[in-house]
Amino acid sequence: MSRQSPSYADCVCSLRTSLAFLESSVATLDNGVQDFPRLCHVLRTVRHYELIPQTTLAAAEASLRDEIGPFIQLLLDRAEKHLDRQARRIETLKARAELNAGRLSQYSGDGHNNGKFSGQGMDFRKSRPLNGEAALRAKVVRQRKEALKYSVERLEMEVRQKERELKLRLEQA
């Protein structure tokens, strides 16, 4: 009986090794065919395309291209015009920012104008103090003067912008 015992042990060990090898093979096969349903669907779709003649496909592509081509061109033109408009807007905003920066640098900390108009005429603020109504009128005149200067500067900026745009158009033409 002792002689049969080692042979049974060898048999059980061999059976366990075979079982492990079989489980490994099943796992490998499982991984190999896991994508099989999707692969079948893809291949079935390819077969459908193979059933349609090449001339029919070419005609359908040409028809589709003719149908949507003008719309694509229209969208591209719109996008190009929008980009040009945005570029002009950016240039205008840059010019306005430069103008505002120049204005800010012209004014001192107390709010009086040190700009191009300050040397003209007399400065009535230093001559004599004004009463209530005259002070109010002087303030209104100063505000109107500032508004007019701002308008002149803005118009000058617009003229410079138009000149730049005209130069760009002439260079492109």
From Swiss-Prot:
InterPro entries in the record: DASH_Spc19
Primary localization class, coarse: nucleus
Location of the protein in the cell: Nucleus; Cytoplasm, Cytoskeleton, Spindle; Chromosome, Centromere, Kinetochore
Signal peptide from the UniProt entry: none
Keyword Transferase: no
Domain of life (superkingdom): Eukaryota
Swiss-Prot/TrEMBL keywords: Centromere, Chromosome, Cytoplasm, Cytoskeleton, Kinetochore, Nucleus
Keyword Signal: no
GO BP annotations listed: attachment of mitotic spindle microtubules to kinetochore; attachment of spindle microtubules to kinetochore; mitotic sister chromatid biorientation; protein transport along microtubule to mitotic spindle pole body
Gene Ontology cellular-component annotations: cytoplasm; DASH complex; kinetochore; mitotic spindle; spindle microtubule
Family, per entry: Belongs to the DASH complex SPC19 family.
Role of this protein: Component of the DASH complex that connects microtubules with kinetochores and couples microtubule depolymerisation to chromosome movement; it is involved in retrieving kinetochores to the spindle poles before their re-orientation on the spindle in early mitosis and allows microtubule depolymerization to pull chromosomes apart and resist detachment during anaphase.
Subunit details: Component of the DASH complex consisting of ASK1, DAD1, DAD2, DAD3, DAD4, DAM1, DUO1, HSK3, SPC19 and SPC34, with a stoichiometry of one copy of each subunit per complex. Multiple DASH complexes oligomerize to form a ring that encircles spindle microtubules and organizes the rod-like NDC80 complexes of the outer kinetochore. DASH complex oligomerization strengthens microtubule attachments. On cytoplasmic microtubules, DASH complexes appear to form patches instead of rings.
Name by which UniProt lists this protein: DASH complex subunit SPC19
Gene that this polypeptide is encoded by: SPC19
